[in-house]
């Protein structure tokens, strides 16, 4: 299937996959990664994307394996006037397992004198598979439709189900509601509700939270 000229970076391989998509029927699967910088890369045409000028860039990413959150980068690799390879950040986004998140910068200036340009997507420090969809370059200032950003809490505290940074009776009430409902809509609440870290949220977690609050 057509990967739209995207290629694997480093040890990574790429292929189209119908497992998930942001738009259409398929997305680009990036797999076989052995380091965080192993990702997907695509050459930029210097006639379409002129060094020294501004452009809008966007790409949507998602993943299913690994940690609850992951940090993704959209970057530009290029050769400068001295012949040295440089790496410049276009956009950063923190993603959540099973969700789509958008890497976007409406006004990115391609460094003047850049040659052999490639845009690429990588992670901060993980090696799990991930997916890319709707990677687009456009006129500067263009707001490219996409998944948008995800509001990720700075810290996740076991038992802090309402994510306000404090464990109190409101969290116990939320835990009881979650137990009655069979779970939580918020993935972060679901994560911290598993107080005993059994990988399953159940009555034992509610009891442990209740006991903690009674101390």
Q: Which residues are covered by each model-predicted region?
A:
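Extra-cytoplasmic beta-strand recognition segments
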Residues: 1, 28, 38-73, 103-110, ...
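Extracellular glycan-recognition surfaces and repeat-rich motifs
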Residues: 1-29
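Surface-exposed loops/turns
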Residues: 51-52, 97, 112, 197
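Extracellular recognition modules
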Residues: 58, 118-122, 210
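Short, surface-exposed beta-strand/strand-loop-strand elements in extracellular ectodomains
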Residues: 73-79
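Extracellular carbohydrate recognition and processing domains
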Residues: 82-114
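Extracellular carbohydrate recognition
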Residues: 122-140
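Cellulosome-associated attachment modules in secreted, modular CAZymes
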Residues: 147-215
């Amino acid at each position: 299937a057509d990967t739209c000229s995207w290629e694997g970076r480093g040890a990574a391989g790429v292929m189209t996959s119908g497992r998930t998509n942001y738009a259409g029927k398929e997305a680009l699967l990036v797999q076989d990664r052995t380091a965080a910088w192993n990702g997907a890369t695509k050459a930029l045409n210097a006639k379409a994307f002129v060094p020294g000028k501004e452009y809008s860039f966007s790409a949507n990413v998602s993943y299913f394996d690994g940690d609850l959150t992951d940090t993704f980068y959209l970057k530009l690799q290029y050769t400068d006037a001295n012949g040295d390879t440089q790496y410049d950040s276009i956009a950063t986004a923190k993603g959540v397992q099973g969700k789509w998140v958008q890497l976007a910068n409406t006004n990115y200036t391609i460094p003047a004198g850049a040659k052999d340009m490639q845009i690429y997507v990588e992670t901060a420090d993980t090696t799990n598979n991930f997916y890319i969809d709707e990677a687009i370059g456009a006129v500067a200032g263009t707001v490219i439709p996409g998944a948008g950003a995800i509001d990720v809490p700075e810290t996740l505290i076991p038992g802090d189900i309402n994510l306000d940074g404090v464990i109190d009776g409101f969290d116990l009430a939320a835990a009881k509601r979650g137990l009655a409902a069979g779970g939580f809509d918020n993935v972060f609440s679901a994560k911290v509700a598993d107080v005993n870290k059994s990988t399953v949220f159940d009555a034992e977690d509610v009891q442990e939270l209740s006991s903690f609050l009674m101390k």
